[in-house]
Amino acid sequence: MTRTVTIVNTADIELVESKGSREGRAAGKAFPLDTGIPGVILEFSWRFYDKGYGTPRHRHIFDQYRYNLTGRRMIKDGFLEAGEVGFYPEGVYYGPQLQEEPCTGLGLQFQGLSGIPYITHAQLREARKALIAEGGAFKDGIYTKIEPDGHKVNVDSHFACTQYMSGRKLSFPQGRFEKPIVMRPQGHPWIRDRKLEGVEHKRLGQFGGSGIRFTRLQPGARIPAQRFEDAEIRYLVEGSIEYGGKTWQA
């Protein structure tokens, strides 16, 4: 598969209200993302969470990065101030979350090291409809169903949908960290790139097969065209760049 660069303006993407199983209002802008790498599925989005949005304490069967842009992301064990980054690995509990103020940020989700296939939000919505049709119910982030024998099922809503789409019984992978990792970029110095003049980096962390960094370019600095073996996402948070003969503003 030929790998091409996809570049978009956040302002041009439709804001879609979330109609999932969590409490409170949330909305997002999903960026078009095709890695060009077979089997590598990522979901990257701009997110808004309103006052009153909440989730119970839970864990994922995928890895997730969050970069908080404005406000405070009010999550126990993963609290993010504006400008901070969090890594929420598969199998690691965190939360609950209850927003006492609105916040915005970026979210990136992808398959973790366990190899459990990543289920997209479109697939999750499909699963939710199917599970409701089968007699289940979603409330406060929990999926509940009464089995024919009278047994009551209570599981995390996301896990229930993922298991449904997988078509098999799943178990959470063992967490490789005690809790989510919060990265504070203000405590990281800018390090000059060894090869590129006017380019600096803050390498915040490397976690298994993924990593995250900030890059800063001085006026006139250039990053030459190159081909990567792995998928890479860049989001402009300040200033402007030129790419493909067009100027892009943050």
Predicted regions and their residues:
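Jelly-roll (double-stranded beta-helix
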Residues: 1-67, 72-250
